[in-house]
Amino acid sequence: MLGLYAAYGLLDFVRLRLLVRIASRLYRNLHQRAFAISVLLPLKAGREADRLNPLRDLDHLRGFLSGSGPTVIFDAPWIPFYLLVIYLLHPSLGALATIGALAVVALTAVAEIFGRGPARLTSEAMISQRALAESGRRNAEVVHAMGLSSRLAGRWSDIVHSYLAHQERLSDIIGGTGSLSKALRMALQSSVLGLGAYLVIGGEASPGVIIASSILLGRALAPVDAAIANWKGFLATRHSYFQLKAMLDSFEDPVEPLELPRPQTRLTVERLTVAPPGTPKPTVLDVSFQLSSGAGMAIVGPSGSGKTTLVRALVGAWKPLNGKVRLDGAPLDQWAPHSLGAHIGYLPQDVELFDGTVADNISRFGGKSDPKGVLAAARAAGVYSMIMHLPEGFQTRIGEGGRALSAGQRQLIGLARALYGEPFLVVLDEPNSNLDVEGDAALAGAILAVRQRGGIVIVVAHRPSALTNIDQVLVLANGMVRSFGSREEVLSSMTRPPVPATHRPIIPTQRGVSGHA
């Protein structure tokens, strides 16, 4: 008997080790895809991305699989076998055990039906908690300077109260069904013992039947008890599984396209219509133009005219609803992402740097193999001297988001990152919003250098200093091109006094104005 128990313990230990290895293998196989999806989610799902976290869902799956929860799945198929053996010992004992087991299973179904809603609401409240905490931490300066701490704390308190209310309700449901299950199991085992004793007294069974039926009933009900005990984790894991599966299905691994040659001649935009991710209403409508190598173009227009939307589509960050962006005739979606990234330099309106060194950020985390490229990009952006004055130069760690740097320093390092590797297309969204006079001069020099080496520069401009070394201007209004041409022509037309209404010639309205360099 001791040998059997030892064998049982050894097999259970082996099973748990196998589950841990399976969970680790699943994580190793999916963690890169989950990370890639988490990075791309804001570009695909828009605001919906705030509640999605594939890495968290994958971690939930790994944690559940490496725990005791999955053992229920392996033990549950043995329940009918144990009940059958009890029935063979005596039909009356088998009938009683079967009725009791069905009652315990019914309690599990009750926990599933009534616990599903609170589990979902608990998960949503937890996501809201994390989002608010991250937002407050990211905007700590604004929170402190404008006295928002108490208001954010009040909002946090509301979310926490909601979370705790849903959590308490879920715990009450799981705990209540668990307590009922435990009471029912004790009553059932007592009933089996009593019925067995009655059968023994009546000469219908041997005394050993009492012990055997009690042990077998305990083994039959063990998976159900374990299921109820782990039900809260099971509900969360099931939610994570379906959510992760939906994201993996939506973000299928792209087919690696043929490696295309480095672009050298032109950028072509054909009837481009773009909407922010997750919204059906376009903010850029029917935009067309073409730029040749060596060109420098500024995009100007009032706030909300679609300038940032347009440049996000030009670099491939946002997918257009209609139209194409082409480099040397090839649409952006025909380029492998890593290859396309090497040919594009992008400085967004809100400069986001990563936790790492200055060199890591400039080199797009590939600088250990190309230190000369890092130095060249820093000099091209006019930021070399500033970096040399940092505590550890290029090896200075800048913290998440570049919090160790000023806004102007972040912008210049972001410019150096955009220039790293001498990309063919350089897109700068309000690159001088935080720059001083020296920074403006460095920006103008960088734009000229890109044009002189045969690249194309596109600048979203609000300040006149950003138009230095720019030869063409595209004017956007309400998402449509209002004017496109040489800088002198467009700027003079923008400053020309309007023609009085009584003398203004009637000109047919045209949409989708396009120009060619």
Task: List each model region and its residues.
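Cytosolic ends of transmembrane helices, especially the final helix of ABC transmembrane type-1 domains
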Residues: L148, D172, A220-M247
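ABC ATPase nucleotide-binding domain helical subdomain, centered on the C-loop/LSGGQ "ABC signature"
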Residues: Q334, A359-E400, A444-G445, A449, ...
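Short intracellular "coupling" helices and adjacent cytoplasmic loop segments at the cytosolic face
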Residues: S24-R25, Q32-L58, L132-R155, N230, ...
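Conserved signature/switch motifs of ABC ATPase nucleotide-binding domains
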Residues: G421, R453
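An intracellular "coupling" helix at the cytosolic face of ABC transporter transmembrane type-1 domains
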Residues: L43-K44, D57-L65, G69, G117-P118, ...
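Transmembrane helices of ABC transporter permease
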Residues: M1-D12, T71-T122, G194-A205, A222
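Hydrophobic alpha-helical segments in the permease module
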Residues: L2-D12, G100-A103, I174, G178-L188, ...
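Helix-to-loop junction immediately C-terminal to a conserved catalytic motif
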Residues: V315
